[in-house]
Amino acid sequence: MKVEIFCDGACSGNPGVGGWGSILRYGDTVKELSGADGDTTNNRMEMTAAIEALASLKRPCEVVLTTDSQYLVKGMTEWMSGWIRKGWVNSKKEPVLNRELWERLLALSKIHKIRWAWVRGHNGHPENERCDELARAAIEVFKGRKP
């Protein structure tokens, strides 16, 4: 099955309360997911949006995952193999941040065939804008306010 995933993360303070939002589209079906965390970073929320969307798929899929996070796209397409080869240290010889999330993404990428795509954030891309709305609404719900 072919699936389009769009995802975004947001933080109120960085670190701070964060939210994530994802849209999954397959055939005529569109599904929206979102959530929040009380103490996180924008990068962790970007990654969580992708993880939750991929984890929600019931069987192996062909996925195009679109995000405005260069950190996420470059991590999965350029940096991951080097981190693994070097024992999860980065080019500065420091432990890779968010390793547990990268490892979850790696495991999910072995289940699904994923093409990682980057789009400029806050630039009028409808699905990216909607994911941002979902992420920000999740922050407000977490804080106890109506979105």
UniProtKB/Swiss-Prot annotation:
Mg(2+) 1 binds at residues 8, 46, 68. Gene3D superfamilies: Ribonuclease H-like superfamily/Ribonuclease H. The keyword rRNA-binding does not apply. It comes from the Bacteria. Binds 1 Mg(2+) ion per subunit. May bind a second metal ion at a regulatory site, or after substrate binding. Its EC number is 3.1.26.4. InterPro entries: RNase_H, RNaseH-like_sf, RNaseH_domain, RNaseH_sf, RNaseHI. GO terms for biological process: DNA replication, removal of RNA primer. It catalyses: Endonucleolytic cleavage to 5'-phosphomonoester. Mg(2+) 2 binds at residues 8, 132. Keywords: Cytoplasm, Endonuclease, Hydrolase, Magnesium, Metal-binding, Nuclease. It is found in: Cytoplasm. One of its GO terms (cellular component) is cytoplasm. Endonuclease that specifically degrades the RNA of RNA-DNA hybrids. This is Ribonuclease H. It comes from Geotalea uraniireducens (strain Rf4) (Geobacter uraniireducens).
